[in-house]
């Protein structure tokens, strides 16, 4: 007999309304952040919608992001933006604070925070100018 899977993180969190609140909390922090705000367009609403769709899909809320925007391709979609280690860390800090602020139960908060920690470094696409070029010969 096969085991019936339990509820998804999406369901445990409270569905789309919970992810919309999370995204609103995150973008409120971005709005006031001197490092990250310049990387975003003046109108934050489309980005909020897209992030909400992405998170909902990733955590088990159906194919809403893919249905609207195609495959997520995170690295490709973020390639135009200079994401330094400092910017990535700030993004992770703001997202983690937004997650914790929601008061999710541990079975929701833990995987969300683990995802942020795991995914954030993969989006770094620009090193600071003071980093030695490791491709240069001796």
Regions found by a protein language model. Give the residues of each.
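Core of compact, soluble alpha-helical bundle domains
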Residues: 1-138
